[in-house]
Amino acid sequence: MGSRSAKIAAAVETYLYPDADFLVDLHSGDIHEMVVPFAFFPVAAGETVEKKAAAAARALSLSWRVASTAKNGLYSWAAQKGIPALLLERGGLGRWTEREVDAYRINLYELLVHLDILPESILESVKGMNLKDSESSPESEVLPSGKIEQREIRIMRYLEAPGNGFWYPAIREGSCL
């Protein structure tokens, strides 16, 4: 029958994906690091899916969107099935703040407006909505429109240490190197 995880994955693929027009996966960084809020969008699932996902990422008040070639996660497998998808990252260290939850709520409303599910006027009525305060990244630049200037990373590089041990970052998330 497979592991519990395999059963969950099969249920998602069988019951969720066939009816999905768009998928968004919310994450909270990794247990070992803090991250600047960003969105992964799939680039390994064809031009149509990539364009729809990238346009959706651009509609969100996040500083970064990152092209992803992943093929085996919830959002990336949805993309392989022809469903535009995003993975949003915010926070880290296995915890979250109310501000991060509020920022995710705003991002979800922004996505629903982008997908023409809700009218743009709904954004103003979201309780406590303030785009200038929704982004926790120290290097964010809020444009006169209230939107956050967003940049794109086309090639993601992961650094790996040559040996085992503990990682103690010497810089904070969002620092310019």
Protein language model annotation of sequence segments:
Residues 1-177:
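Structured catalytic-domain cores with a bias toward divalent-metal coordination
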